[in-house]
């Protein structure tokens, strides 16, 4: 029965396509939905034979689709989930109460501390107190320039290094050459003012 309905469904689909393509369009192009004719499907008038045939074939197509759905559901009413096999022979996930070993389970044996048993990181070298530096490294201090010069002189004397002292001349920055003197700018302003006065 379902194979006959399926064949009829295919024939109806092909017939609907052919009948719709043979019909004359009710309106042309984009002007179908505007202008004097305000109806959606074109001018209302007596329906032609092709229009009636299209409606009849469409109604048969819908009825055939509903019938196919009903018969397929009746014939193959089983779900895929109904056909899956379940194993009832599975062992329980939680073991019996007497089989737990309290020596290995930290929740049952409070004497075990998981932090004490944690392995150390083999990538990190272990430092002993003998390897620590004797004096901390000197950090630069934020002091006045005079105090910094005194500290540098004292450090140079302690370390035995000569010629480290800075002079005030070395600390100054040389003047830049890209700056223009202001006298030139004032001369040009005076020159432009004279031109304005002449006009």
UniProtKB/Swiss-Prot annotation:
Polar residues compositional bias, start-end: 118-130
Compartments, as annotated in UniProt: Cell membrane
Biased composition regions of type Basic and acidic residues, renumbered to the chain: 146-171
Keyword Chloroplast in annotation: no
Protein family: Belongs to the SecG family.
Source superkingdom: Bacteria
Stretches the record annotates as Disordered: 92-199
Region forming the signal peptide: none
Gene name, Swiss-Prot/TrEMBL: secG
Matching NCBIfam families: secG
Compositional bias ranges of the Low complexity kind: 97-115, 172-188
Topology class, membrane: Multi-pass membrane protein
InterPro entries with a match to the protein in the record: SecG
Record field: transmembrane: 2-22, 49-69
Role played: Involved in protein export. Participates in an early event of protein translocation.
Gene Ontology molecular function, alphabetical: protein-transporting ATPase activity
Any one Gene Ontology BP term: protein secretion
Assigned GO CC terms: plasma membrane
Record's protein name: Protein-export membrane protein SecG
Keyword field: Cell membrane, Membrane, Protein transport, Translocation, Transmembrane, Transmembrane helix, Transport
């Amino acid at each position: 029965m379902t194979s006959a309905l399926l064949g009829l469904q295919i024939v109806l689909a092909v017939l609907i396509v052919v009948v719709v393509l043979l019909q004359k369009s009710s309106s042309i192009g984009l002007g179908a939905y505007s202008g004097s004719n305000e109806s959606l499907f074109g001018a209302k008038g007596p329906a032609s034979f092709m229009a009636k045939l299209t409606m009849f074939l469409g109604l048969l197509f819908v009825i055939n689709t509903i019938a196919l759905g009903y018969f397929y559901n009746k014939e193959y009413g089983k779900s895929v989930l109904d056909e899956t096999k379940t194993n009832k022979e599975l062992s329980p996930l939680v073991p019996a109460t007497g089989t737990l070993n309290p020596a290995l389970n930290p929740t049952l044996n409070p004497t075990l501390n998981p932090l004490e048993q944690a392995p150390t990181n083999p990538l990190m070298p272990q430092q002993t107190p003998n390897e620590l530096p004797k004096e901390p490294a000197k950090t630069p201090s934020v002091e006045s320039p005079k105090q910094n010069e005194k500290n540098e002189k004292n450090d140079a004397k302690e370390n035995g290094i000569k010629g480290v002292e800075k002079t005030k001349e070395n600390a100054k920055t040389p003047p830049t050459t890209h700056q223009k003197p202001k006298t030139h700018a004032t001369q040009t302003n005076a020159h432009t003012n004279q031109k304005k006065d002449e006009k």
